[in-house]
Amino acid sequence: MQVIRLAALSDNYIFLLHDSHKNIAAVVDPAEAEPVLKQLAQLKAELVAIFNTHHHNDHVGGNQKLIQKFPQVKVYGGAKDQGRIPGQQVFLQPGDRVQFADRVAEVIFVPGHTRAHIAYYFPPQTDDTPGELFCGDTLFAGGCGRLFEGTPAQMVESLTKLRSLPENTRVWCAHEYTLKNLQFALSVDSKNTELQKRLDEVKTKRSQGIATVPSLLGVEKLTNPFLRWEQPSLQLAVNSNDPVQTFARIRGLKDKF
């Protein structure tokens, strides 16, 4: 399974999954249809599935046009998003599995950004290959999503689930927010040398127009403050020794950054 990253809107990423043996494709969070249709035409591939992580328009905005072009496509989303995702046919529960070609993804319930948010995790096929995590707006490179419908406690629980995946997991998040995220992270975790090193690398990449997605989960665990709420340095920075309160205070600071 090849993952093709497509830029969309101002800072979104759409992910096209392509199986070259069957020449079929699936798409994760089509913010708009045009980049997907263009890539499918180049591949001469058939779209068989739309995997939505949540209902926000910059993740589902392309659904209807893709359905019109490929009437047999199946549209997947969380069960709690029923009525909010255009064209949704499959209503996924936590722990469900979805298949694309010869790969099977686990559905992880990750409320916080929205009340119904899910992530799709394709485990590695061999010991020396990475798993693939499509996490929408729950976990970002260097950050996490705003809490529009969920609570800090829910988001901590959701991020704990994602944090427990193998460290070589590739994190396919839906926005190019990494530079600003890491600039904020350094403001609350200023003595983190791994973070400073990563920020310097990201500055160079972005100055050259290079994408910073995917990232690796192991790197996130070392540098992303929203996965590090137990760290004494971060707790000291926000004057809290409670994990949920620490997370909430860091999130509050980020909202104003």
UniProtKB/Swiss-Prot annotation:
One of its GO terms (biological process) is methylglyoxal catabolic process to D-lactate via S-lactoyl-glutathione. Zn(2+) 1 binds at residues 54, 56, 113, 137. Disulfide bonds: none annotated. Zn(2+) 2 binds at residues 58-59, 137, 175. The keyword Zinc applies. Signal peptide: none annotated. CDD domains: hydroxyacylglutathione_hydrolase_MBL-fold. Its EC number is 3.1.2.6. Its cofactor is Zn(2+). It catalyses: an S-(2-hydroxyacyl)glutathione + H2O = a 2-hydroxy carboxylate + glutathione + H(+). Binds 2 Zn(2+) ions per subunit. One of its GO terms (molecular function) is hydroxyacylglutathione hydrolase activity. InterPro entries: Clx_II_MBL, Glyoxalase_II_hydrolase, HAGH_C, Hydroxyacylglutathione_Hdrlase, Metallo-B-lactamas, RibonucZ/Hydroxyglut_hydro. Keywords: Hydrolase, Metal-binding, Zinc. It comes from the Bacteria. Pathway: Secondary metabolite metabolism; methylglyoxal degradation; (R)-lactate from methylglyoxal: step 2/2. Thiolesterase that catalyzes the hydrolysis of S-D-lactoyl-glutathione to form glutathione and D-lactic acid. Belongs to the metallo-beta-lactamase superfamily. Glyoxalase II family. Monomer. This is Hydroxyacylglutathione hydrolase. The lineage of its organism: Bacteria, Bacillati, Cyanobacteriota, Cyanophyceae, Nostocales. The gene is gloB.
